Regions:
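Short, low-complexity N-terminal intrinsically disordered segments enriched in polar/charged residues
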Residues: 1-27, 31
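A beta-strand edge to alpha-helix "cap/lid" segment located at domain peripheries
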Residues: 2-4, 53-118
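Helix-to-beta-strand junctions that scaffold the AdoMet/dcAdoMet cofactor pocket
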Residues: 34
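A broad detector of the eukaryotic-type serine/threonine protein kinase catalytic domain
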Residues: 37-38, 116
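A short gly/proline-enriched turn/hairpin at secondary-structure junctions
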Residues: 38-47
């Protein structure tokens, strides 16, 4: 069963990822991932620090976006934070759920993206 979360309830790594990405601070974002982390984005999977650092560095400056928090949930060890993204990317507006799993030390172990629930 999902537990609903407020923005203030989100773990530090989730806030760090969103704030770091919005601030285009690649080093901050990279430091949030565990050594064996896995990110899946747009059909591509990135494993480990080297691949994830490449994903961050290639993506962090691609588009200018503004995020609006829509809601969050926790379910079976996954923290899903939903945002409305508006920016200069194709389509201009999208609602996404950032799906985080954290390790015991609070670092990001996995990150996936899905369409946010309506």
């Amino acid at each position: 069963m999902d537990k609903q979360l407020e923005n203030s309830d989100l773990p530090a790594a989730v806030h760090g990822f969103v704030d770091g990405w919005q601030g285009r601070n690649a080093e901050k974002v990279e430091g949030l991932f565990a050594a064996d982390a896995v990110v899946t984005d747009e059909g591509h999977t990135y494993r480990g620090r080297d691949e994830i650092n490449g994903w961050v560095r290639n993506g962090i400056n691609l588009f200018s976006t503004t995020l609006t928090f829509l809601g969050a949930r926790e379910a079976e060890g996954m923290v899903g934070a939903s945002y409305r993204l508006e920016g200069d990317f194709p389509g201009g507006v999208v609602a996404l759920e950032y799906q985080f799993r954290l390790d015991e030390s609070g670092q990001i172990a996995t990150l996936d993206f899905a369409e946010a629930a309506a």
